[in-house]
């Protein structure tokens, strides 16, 4: 009968056979299960690490894009403000040009009116001189026709003044 190990009643052959099967099972598990399982775990670990790296890169890129967008927005605001300032300046310049043109036109109209008034005045003076000359000739002819006394001269002058006043 085979010897017992440590006082147990299990034969040594059974223990050796069980140990052999167990070691064989460990070798087979290591070769067929543990190796591929560890490979899968390693791949999974690498995949997770790659995903984390990609997420960190994407996060950094997103932060960079956000900062670029902020800069672009800031620049757009500055450009918009400059555009508004240019438009205001252009409006003021245009206003000044319009006011200057209006003043110039008003001066032109005023000068034209002054010239027209001067021309009308000269025509009125010429007409008055013509009437005075005509009346002077008429008075002279009346004086020549009759010899005037002092009373007649006064009356003639008053009549002449009256005629000149009515002619106006």
Curated annotation (Swiss-Prot):
PANTHER family: ATP SYNTHASE SUBUNIT B (PTHR33445:SF1), ATP SYNTHASE SUBUNIT B', CHLOROPLASTIC (PTHR33445). The chain crosses the membrane at residues 9-29. F(1)F(0) ATP synthase produces ATP from ADP in the presence of a proton or sodium gradient. F-type ATPases consist of two structural domains, F(1) containing the extramembraneous catalytic core and F(0) containing the membrane proton channel, linked together by a central stalk and a peripheral stalk. During catalysis, ATP synthesis in the catalytic domain of F(1) is coupled via a rotary mechanism of the central stalk subunits to proton translocation. Signal peptide: none annotated. This is ATP synthase subunit b. SUPFAM superfamilies: F1F0 ATP synthase subunit B, membrane domain. It comes from the Bacteria.
